[in-house]
Every structure is written in C-alpha cells, then in structure tokens.
Amino acid sequence: MLNRIFSREAIFIVAVMWGVFLIDLVLPGISFNHLGIKPRNFQGLIGILFSPFLHGGFSHIIANTIPLLLLSGFVRLSIGPQKMLYVMSIGVLGSGLGTWLFSSGDLVIGASGLVFSLIGFLLADAWFSPTLRSWTVAILSFFLYGGALLSFFVYVPFISWAAHFWGFCSGLAIALSMRRSR
C-alpha cells in the first residue's frame, strides 16, 4: 500500500534532503546552505536547483518532509508516476525562478516552494480536470494543508513568502497546462 502512495522518487528526494541536513549537522564547519537561492544575484541561480535539499534546522526539515511525501503521493495517485515527476520538476523550477526574481530575502533555502507547488497543482487539477479522484485528493490536500495558504497573508520572520507564493502559482500553471478535456 505504501509503495503506491510514496514513490521512490519522492523518497529519494527526502533521503537527499536528510543526508545533506545530517552532513551539515554532524560535520563542523561544513554547511551547504550557502548554495540556496540568492535573489537577483547571478551566482544565486544555482540555488533554484539546490534550495529544496537545504534546510535551516530540524523543525524546518520536518515541516517539509511530511507534506512533501504526502502531497507527492497524492499527485502520483491523481495523475500517475511519470506526470508526478514532471509536476515536481517544473514546480521546483517555477518556485525557484519566481523566488529568485521577486524575493526580498537574502538567502532562501528549503523545499516549501515545491510543497506549495504540489498544493497548487492538486487544487487546480481538480478544477481544470475534474474527476472523483482529483476532487477527493484536492479536498484531502486542502483539509491537511489548506491552512498553509495563510502564509501568503501573514508575515513570519525567516519564512519566504515568495517561495510559497511562486510555488503555488507554479502548481496552478502546471495544472492549467496539463488539463484534460472534460
């Protein structure tokens, strides 16, 4: 049952996140977090690819691990494993590019842009390609993580609203581009 929900790809992403986090934690003087997104800095573009694997602390990585596993599993159940990889890849690129262009922060790390792209995709997929499965998954996703959307309206220090916002927008755009005929 779990192998139908949690894909090897999502487990691999989470394993890399935790591996990088543990290296940062255990080896003094080593930190990969400087590889995050540095907004509007040419060298910071590399952070678009690395940022989802970098986290600032235990609570940060936990806050991204659980939703990443669950939501990627919901995407997989809704549209299949191949399309899930597409959604996740474009979600990382879209949230990262939006964050790089528009964030007011100094350095942005974490997988929350990807998480929000998955939320945006699942909600929009139910709207643009309505099926019983897509609506069930969207309602469940909203029930579990809909409160996270409040981060668009509330300032929380050290949390990148830009990553959340552009991740969500990326998810909406992905669902729109993949909409199935009614």
Q: What positions do the PLM features span?
A:
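A detector for small-residue-rich transmembrane helices and their helix-helix packing motifs
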Residues: 1-182
